[in-house]
Amino acid sequence: MHFTEIINQLPQLKIFKDNTYNIQISYRYQKFNEEIPILFLHGFNGNSKSWAYQFHYFKGRRSVIAIDAPGFGQSDPSDLDMLSISNIVYNLLKSIDVTKCDLVGHSMGGMLAQIVASKHSKLINKVILSCTHKGYAMPVGSSLRDPYKLRLEERKQMSNKEFGQLRIQKM
């Protein structure tokens, strides 16, 4: 099946309003059965569409949820820290009656997955991390390291295509 067809089969975006943090978070939810669902957290510059192949593969097998992190997809931009975002993930899952999930995080989503799993461990059945690391053990509230500041600045100034081409050159 062609990628365009797979994208077109994605579940529609839904919006969760977190009143604790006053933020709207977009997400996709493909409910299949009452088994433990799989929650996917995307990497930097990704969104819930990043998991299109996983939605396609698990259709008819498992329930799948993919959340757009703040500032990605249709989620409100925010400067919230990862602990706060992990609480939003927890609140969103509670709002859709998910009491346990298998958690998959890629890159930045993997860093978030580690925090979700450590702070909301009763919610997590399994954790799978892809292309992530534990961070640099920097104190909460520390400024980002220079390479990440530069990447964020480049992202603000470029179109999706320009930024994608730049990132490919740097791989």
Task: Tell me the role of every PLM-derived stretch.
Residues L150-R155, G164-M171:
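Helix-loop "lid/cap" segments that line or gate small-molecule binding pockets
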